[in-house]
Amino acid sequence: VNMDESLPGIGQPPPLKREHRLYQADFLMRFYGFKAGELLSEDNQSFNDYIDPKCQWAVGHLERFPVEIMTADYYTLLRVPGIGTNSVRRIIKARKHAKLSFADLKKMGVVLKRALYFITCDGRMMYNTKLDESYITRHLIYNERPDNMLLADNKSCTYEQMSIFDFISE
């Protein structure tokens, strides 16, 4: 039996949050076309406790974003946090007939609180948003559960406190 410290003790279940993140990652690999090496790497060996694996991947690959809703292909749209398989099909079908707005995306089931950092509609982002890893991660954590900002271990957390100026458009 392996006595590695990173394993749960005998008779102890694995941490539920970790189990849930592994389930989400499995789902991404089965239905969204992700590879295990894309979700975790030598540099990033574990999942973030506060954001899901799809968001974590997107934040780590900001060079691929923002994605234009009107022109992005099926597999590119699948990689956008907040957009699932049903929403991708609806987007591709609807954009053949009209330009899509953020209101249209919301009606189609897109979770805009996650997707807004990674998409454009007609060349425009929903808000004046910085494509910055720390900024986006901070806002994703806050949007998921506002109390997460209080739960985060301040010693290991590199995320900065949100500023009122983050919400003011120039």
Question: Where are the language model's segments positioned?
Answer:
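Conserved, mostly hydrophobic/aromatic
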Residues: 25, 91
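Flexible glycine/acidic-rich beta-alpha junction loops that bind and position SAM and/or redox cofactors
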Residues: 1-16, 32-61
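Anionic-ligand-binding alpha/beta catalytic cores of soluble enzymes and soluble regulatory domains
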Residues: 18-21
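C-terminal extensions
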Residues: 46-76, 102-170
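Residue-level signature of tetratricopeptide-repeat
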Residues: 94-95
